[in-house]
């Protein structure tokens, strides 16, 4: 009788006080592409145990042909989906996100929409998405088959079976303002436009 042996390697990175988890890495096939998924906040399930979210992430990642996933979050504090312990900034977490997405073949932004009106969520989302701009060509979100339910968290019933949709950072945060080059005389430029218009008349 034929048998199949599989190995699931797990690596988890925590803060020194073990109150934050910056990275949960699951690898089952080194020869296949890897993805990074950014969600809201981590649970304590980081080893043998799998919470519902991680289980859905692993199943869907495997079905889509990936061989590993880096599970990341906007906020690193364990079991804080209510964002009661949320900080304005977390450089260590942001650094972990950037290091992961640099190596990933695809990035999935899946923080969900449940906290979209929260100021601390908006602030952290802007920080993270700004850092993701250089990797925007790899950025996607979860959607349903019709493509109407975008920006979903993996626990959303609408995306239990994943469909990926390209995501532009500008869909969620404003584009940075373009600064005028030094020495540019804006008033003079406006005046020249006016004169040109008169001459054209």
Regions found by a protein language model. Give the residues of each.
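Compositionally biased amphipathic helical and low-complexity segments enriched in hydrophobic
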Residues: 9, 33, 130-133
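Helix-enriched interaction subdomains in cytosolic or periplasmic regions
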Residues: 1-14
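Glycine/proline-rich loop-helix segments at beta-alpha junctions forming the active-site rim
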Residues: 85-201
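A polyanion-binding, active-site-adjacent surface
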Residues: 15-106, 110-119
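Generic secretory/membrane-interface signal
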Residues: 10-11, 67, 147, 195
């Amino acid at each position: 009788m034929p048998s199949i042996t599989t190995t699931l390697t797990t690596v988890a990175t925590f803060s020194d006080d073990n109150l934050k988890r910056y990275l949960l890495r699951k690898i089952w096939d080194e020869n296949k592409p890897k993805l990074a998924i950014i969600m809201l906040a981590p649970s304590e399930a980081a080893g043998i145990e799998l919470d519902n979210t991680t289980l859905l992430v692993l199943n869907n990642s495997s079905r889509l042909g990936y061989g590993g996933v880096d599970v990341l979050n906007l906020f690193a504090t364990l079991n804080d989906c209510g964002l009661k312990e949320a900080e304005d900034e977390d450089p260590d977490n942001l650094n972990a996100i950037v290091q992961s997405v640099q190596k990933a073949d695809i990035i999935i932004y899946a923080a969900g929409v449940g906290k979209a009106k929260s100021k601390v969520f908006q602030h952290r989302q802007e920080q993270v998405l700004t850092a993701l701009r250089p990797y925007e060509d790899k950025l996607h979100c979860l959607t349903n088959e019709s493509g109407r339910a975008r920006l979903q968290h993996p626990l959303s019933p609408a995306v239990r079976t994943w469909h990926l949709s390209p995501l532009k950072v500008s869909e969620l945060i404003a584009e940075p303002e373009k600064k005028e080059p030094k020495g540019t005389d804006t008033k003079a430029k406006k005046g020249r436009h006016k004169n040109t218009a008169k001459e054209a008349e």
